[in-house]
Amino acid sequence: FEDSKKTFVYDISEDAWHYRASYDENNRLTFWRYSHVTFAYGKQYVGTTGVLAYMDEKKFTEHDDRVILKMRRGAVVTSNDQPFWIDHLRLICNNGQTSLDNSYTNLELNPRVSFRYSWDGATWSDYEDSYMGRVGNYEWETDLWQCGLGRYFTLEVSTTEPIPFCIQNLQISWSPTSMF
């Protein structure tokens, strides 16, 4: 749907729909620019204007090295509709993971991950950046502190770094409150 600037894709391996996007020449997020997809010779081929490329699980940019946004938005977290305070979040991910081809860019040496959150589902906080740890530092902790107070909390985690990104778990430290 080029007019809506969104592309929805059904992933057979995940048995779920998901949203794909590309950055345009002005670095704005827009619809996924690959409009033709086919599976042949053991590869998933994609086409866009004047280009035939294939999807590679070990490449984390598009065919012309534009970054790929990897984003996950969680479900709403609530405490029985009562207000609560989030003191601390810890993202459990592939901290300190090495590059798949043993070549390291400056970004891969300490890749950045961005958080933003919403307490009402409509307005979002500013992005807050954290890091995933230098290569080999598997004990690195990716944390977000003092997320605020509310009744309904939604978290979004994203990165555009050219690395594998796998969220394994999220720990939330929260406290009930009688404020409001």
Predicted regions and their residues:
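Beta-sheet repeat architectures centered on beta-propellers
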Residues: F1-F180
